[in-house]
Amino acid sequence: MHLYNEWLPPPVAEETKKEKESFARVVRCVKELHRPDDPESVYATLKWISVIELFVRAKSELSVEDVSELVEIGLQIFHSSENKLYAQVRWGNVLVRLINKFRKKLSLKVQWRPLYDTLIHAHFSRSPGPEGWRLRQRHFMAVTSLIRSCRRFFPQGAASEIWSEFMSLLENPWHNSSFEGSGFVRLFLPTNPENQDFFSEKWIKNVLELWDSIPNCQFWNSQWTSVLARVIKNCSFIDWESYLPMLFSRFLNMFEVPVANGSGSYPFSVDVPRNTRFLFSNRTTTPSKSIAQSIVYFLKPGSSAHEQLEKLVNLLEQYYHPSNGGRWTYSLERFLLHLVIAFQKRLQREQQDPDSLPATCLGKPERVAFVGVVLKLIDRGQYSKNEHLSETVAAATSMLSYVEPSLVLPFVASRFHLALETTTATHQLKTAMMSVAFAGRSILQSSMSTAKSQDLGGDVDDRMFLDLIGISLSNALLGMDANDPPKTLATMQLIGSIFSNMAVLDDSSDDLSFMTMASFSEWLDEFLCRLIALLQHLEPNSVINEGLSSSATSGTFLVEDGPYYYCMLEILLGRLSGSLYNQALKKISKFVQTNILPGAIAEVGLLCCACVHSTPEEAVAQIVEPMLLAVISSLKEIPVNGYGGKGSAETLVSNKQDKQTLSPALEAAIDYQLKVLSVAITYGGSSLLPYKGLLIEAISSAFNSSSWKVNGAGDHLLRSLLGSLILYYPIDQYKCLSRHPAAPALEEWISTKASSKDEQVAHSRWHVPTQEETQFANELLDLHLQSALDDLLSICQSNIHSDAGDEKTHLKVTLLRIDSTLQGVLSCLPDFRPSPRHDMVEDLQFFIAGASGSCVGSAEIREKTAITIHAACKYLLEKKSDDSILLILIIRIMDALGNYGSLEYDEWSNHRQAWKLESAAIVEPPANFITEFNSKGKRRPRWALIDKAYMHNTWRSSQSSYHLFRTDGNFSPPEPLTFLVDDLLTLCLHNYETVRVLAGKSLIKLLKRWPQLLSKCVLSLTENLRKPDVQEYVVLGSCAILSSHSVLKHLTTDPKSFSSFLLGILSSSHHESMKSQKAIIELFVKYNIHFAGLSRNILRSLESHVEGSTSGDLVSQIGSMSFDSSSLHWRYNLMANRVLLLLVMSSRIDPSFSLKILDETAGHFLKNLKSQLPQTRILAISALNILLKESPHKMQGKDQPSVSSQETENANSSLDLALSQIFREEGFFKETFESLSHIHITDTDSSSRGNHGSSSFQSMADKSITRFYFEFSASWPRTPSWISLLGSDIFYPSFARIFKRLAQECGVPVLLALKSPLEEFCNAKERPKQCVAAEALAGVLHSDVNGLFNEWDSWIMVQLQNVILGQSVESIPEWAACIRYAVTGKGKQGTKIPVMRQQILDCIVAPLPPTATTTVVAKRYAFLSAALIELSPPKMPVTEVKLHIVLLDELICNMSHSSAQIREAIGVILSVLCSNIRLRMSYQQEYPTEEGKTDVDSQLKEENWFKLISAKASEAVKNIQQASISDSLDTSTDVDMGNAQSNGDSLDDVKWMETLFHFIISSFKSGRASYLLDVIAGFLYPVMSLQETSHKDLSILAKAAFELLKWRVFPESHLQKVIGVILSSADDSNWRIRSSTLTYLRTFMYRHTFILTHEDKQKIWKTVEKLLVDSQVEVREHAAAVLAGLMKGGDEDFAADFRDRSYAEANSIQKRRNRRKSSSTQSIAGVHGAVLGLVASVLSVPYDMPSWLPEHVTLLARFAGEPTPIKSTVTKAVAEFRRTHADTWNIQKDSFTEDQLEILADTSSSSSYFA
């Protein structure tokens, strides 16, 4: 049994034993309801889902057989409800919960294919149902989590099936299907033991190649990282050693951080289509979790993974430093957190699995090494300005301190002392305190544990840590400051977490030796003094608000910002020994009696409450009794009304003095005392019984008072008193019951997953009410509920008050008393008894146990109250309907009466929010290496677990009877309840908004619990929308209730409500006010978003108009509203159209539905295309896209079986006829084009592709009505759009798709009808008109219908040629999109070739007439680039390959074209052509085919284009450089002819180079560079050398290409080539080239540090060192900066070697200088180089102080007297050193000797800095 259930109050715990049987009963019920032959039976099973979830959340003990039976049934139901998304969402989610909870006990076999089919059918198909997008989103989430849960149950062989299924999607990396493919692989691929044999070396190589095919795309990265992380974790048999350098290189480059002053994010990340990002987990950030998990599971004894991790940390640690924060901080913070969590989980797994192999387990050396590395990150991030990072660091410290205390604890201690000493950065103290709080337990355990299994190392003294705790506690006293909330809370957290560890707090015990500075009682005194001072200085957050809403606890930051204050008091007072507790109690009691602090009611109340909770008898005597007496004596002196219910009415009237007012001070004092009392007695229980008389008197006097504020305080007291008497709550919660076996001074903490030896965990003790307490509670009920009810009736029936004001006051007080009692007894007052339907006396069902206290009163009392309140409500609505306080009170009473258990539910959900208890301070991880006790789960202090058990009980009590009547139709709601529902229905249409909202909330809760009442409510509310003269507030109230989920759900199954709802909304256009219109539209939009299809019985009722039912005419009624001609407002016309569409779409699923309606509707929407209303036109487009299907007119492909002729005729003739009649009308298409062109808005900013462009005139609501979810799941284009020269278009694929479907539906007649309007619009002047023409033409060309060839020859081809040769420029983007659409491949992977593609390509490729202008040339190239992107390279037919070859030749000849625009186009097309060819070649190598061996392929293999370009490039670079040199020399005036000639040549070369740079840039931008890396590596030199030339445009392009190059990681195969280029350019004669080589080197080394060989690194180091003594000063300084970066980068042996050499060199120069005093023979460059070597070493450790640093800095400072470039270098370097070490200088300066500090001070200008 789960610990929380074991610890429930005894009466409840007894009941839980019946839960196993009741779960078995539920499973039987579900089984009976589900009939596999009837798919509609799903709806009947839905009501049981919340009951099944109850058992899971109640942590009940269930039998595994029942669970596995339920899971099997659930999966059947899930698969059988194909089109019922809502049912799939509900069942999917509950299955996920069950499978996850019982995953280790179930033995299932789940097939993956049906799950995949569900996913494809609902989310990736082109013809989805009508469901709203919110539902679709939930459905996607549900299905994907179900797949994730079922992965572990996939049978053997599933992995290879899944891989081969999705491999085909991954063939072409430049098609969006590859993104989908990677998402599916990540989602489905199982790594369970049955499938592990699938993961072989070959598979890994394959994955790494695929991963490399799309660079710079975080979506892609995260999919593959996640797949690999799972394989690495679960398949421990794979040897990863050889892949480590490559993988770590990937990991490093996935963190987008700024390297060497570069930017911190990819310049062009590959664009992932919106729907793919939306559907698959779209973490666009770095996949930190998967990276961390992979790294942790790489670690093994003897593996090189640890060195690699160290290198990774060395490179990343600088970005954790507070001064280097940025966008990347989040992903780095996650990385640190997941590293530590994964490490902890792995240790736990190895601890619990005794047979794991020692060869793969982490031993002591591996643990020490790992902790050492992670501490570097912790050290950097500890004082980060980023809140999350500093908290993560503290949590990580805490977890690691249990693994390696000898490393972590000294670090915590030194950091704490550092924070104490700092004077400038005070925020550090808060963080340091948090660290000590989080590591408190491990510090105490390692110091006090008797089992000294861990030796903390010789020089570390145990006392040191105990002192640390002592110091932190004494400092904590200073930290309590009313003006510094964060620090105060951190202090309280610290005290609470340290004392949670102690068994008892007492002076006499020696164990608390850490209280070095004083005895514990002195500390306690000081603490209470500070606390009292803090309370006296608190400022309340807001003015304490009057009226009902002021709770007793609207507190200051101590209460509002977290539970630390209260927890600390409870723990402290609970752990004190007897004598110390009395000492504290005296002090607190004195404080409470002498102070009145209205600003700190809650805080003082909680202080008293904690005292009472700890030892009730004494605390009640010392705190509660004096306060009670004081408040009663004050109450006697104040004026009374006498409505408090003591004594009879006559005596009171005579008693009443003339109205005298109460002084505000006295009122505030009484209010304060009563409220503090009410909080203090919360846990009083039976110790309050002796003061029974006083309490009754205090409450009655408070209600009798004439002050409303005092009445309210009395209400608090009564509530609290009732709760204290009859509720179950834990007592002794904070006492220590079991001591730690290894360290008796500490408390032993408990894990909820108890292993056998912990069985004797002490139970928690509960307050179970005694007979006297229940009796007292019943007396209070008589006094304040029964008598108040009688008063209420008498006020309402016999007018006893002549004065309206008196009557109001009397009503207020009476209602307040009733409310107060009901809120106090919660669900202890029995619920209404429902009336059985068929005179049968039936036992109520039992689901789960739960009660919040013992029973008081009886169900009769509840019924009597309900009937009285019904009468009172009637009276109030007649007489006092404008008095909101009375109405709100009465609604609260109704809520408490009707919604049994909801008060507990509210309390539970509020408390759940307040749980910051999960903080690391009170969690001890399962694997504890300090005491060597390992448990199955995390351990926590007993009080925290009792708290959870208490909340668990509260939740159970709110749920125990909630679902009893929802599942059982045999009970009808009791009569008093129907009264309440009627009253609430009236109140939720009230004209005060507050009243409406409250009543609405309460009503919705009631309807949810009693679904039988729904239809009555829906009918009466929709009636309000239809009535002509209804007030605005009635409409608002009705809409609020109708838009609730319960109602929307109810509409899917109840025909009557459904038709009434729709007609109600559609016939509500007569409401004038803006607010009501807005409410109605919002309701309609919400209905659309959550629309869940219709159940069979509604569809039946729609058709059954034959039998004369009313809703049958629904379709025709709505149809008549949806025509333009009807005089409706345009938005209602739109809504009617939408409803019509929803009905038709829902009914398509039903096979018996008549096709006639479908045809009529399709015709109706086709006509609507030329409607006058723009919104209706947009909806018509959506509708036609859904209703028109591919049809018989499509040409038969080779692989499709031909359909026999007569079938073709019948199949679709009706729709064909219906549509043909419409579009054959004269001028139909012309008008349609006209009206569609108005929707195209040419504004540049909002016309992003695929977005209907109409964003500028569509509000959000209109969008929700006119669009469908699927419009972006079938989005076009299906390939990434990255070509900027195409411009932004306003081409809407959904328009093109209508024309395509029309052509497929009706064949050639459509083409003929389109001919003349197309000819007219293609030549139109306006861009929108040309755009419509482009869409229509694209659709027709892509339709593949019979007869298309003839039309192409007769007129379409001419039309296209005219477009190409046309002079107009502005519509190029649209026509390019048209061509792109027309040649787009068909099918999911875009590999099926459309029939017209070849013709269209030939038409574009055809050479232009010689007279063509550059505009036309540019246009042709734009069209070409658009068309070529769409080809699918792996499977190109030979014709397309030939086309590629022809084009390549043409383009290479044209690379020096005179127009810049055309050069760019040529560069872009070249990158597409070359990468297409390369991809095809690599595909042919892997999957060679027989017909593949044609002459074309051998032509491709020669790669002539590559040779040509490479040869030309090196020649061009030389020419350009020479030309620029001769330009600079050539100042003479007489230019000879040869020179001019060469100038022209060099200009051609410049143009040629520009084209080449465009080629490089577009290869990177498009992500196609992966296939062209060898080509690009060859062009590295031109890019580096042409950054500074006299040709501005060329240099700009070179710089752009250079920026992109910096991000590229080259694979090992091309590295040698790149390094060769780098080394040779570092020797270049031009110093600018040397400098740009250095710039490239910095990022190059960072990106490739894992994959470079030792020799290569050596060469590079040598080269850079040589540049330290370069003749050009800029190069020297640059080289020093690069070296500093290289030294940070983790190659310690190189760095150390260089440091020693440079130090020796500089030292010898310095000595020679000192000897000669005269200027030496050595050149300036030599000395400068030596100094720069020192500078590089000093700057390579910006924040640390390694042992060699002081000498280096001092030596550097000695050079300050040198001449100019050297002097400034030294000064800058020393200043930089000083800046970066300023934070920790206080400690670091101890590393220097006096002399060294003096030399430093001489160099520094402001010596005060260095004390």
From Swiss-Prot:
Keywords: DNA damage, DNA repair, Proteasome, Repeat
MF annotations from Gene Ontology: lysine-acetylated histone binding; peptidase activator activity; proteasome binding
GO CC terms, sorted: proteasome complex
InterPro entries in UniProt: ARM-like, ARM-type_fold, Blm10_mid, PSME4, PSME4_C
A Pfam family of this chain: HEAT_PSME4_mid
KW DNA damage (keyword) present: yes
Disulfide-bond pairs as recorded: none
UniProt-listed GO biological process terms: DNA repair
Region spans: Bromodomain-like (BRDL): 1626-1711
HEAT repeat residues: 563-599, 1156-1193, 1442-1479, 1613-1650, 1655-1692, 1746-1783
Induction: Upon MG132 treatment.
Reported phenotype of the disruption mutant: No visible phenotype.
Domain comment in the entry: The bromodomain-like (BRDL) region specifically recognizes and binds acetylated histones.
Role played: Associated component of the proteasome that specifically recognizes acetylated histones and promotes ATP- and ubiquitin-independent degradation of core histones during DNA damage response. Recognizes and binds acetylated histones via its bromodomain-like (BRDL) region and activates the proteasome by opening the gated channel for substrate entry. Binds to the core proteasome via its C-terminus, which occupies the same binding sites as the proteasomal ATPases, opening the closed structure of the proteasome via an active gating mechanism.
Known partners and oligomeric status: Interacts with the 26S proteasomes.
Family recorded in the similarity comment: Belongs to the BLM10 family.
Protein name (Swiss-Prot/TrEMBL): Proteasome activator subunit 4
Species: Arabidopsis thaliana
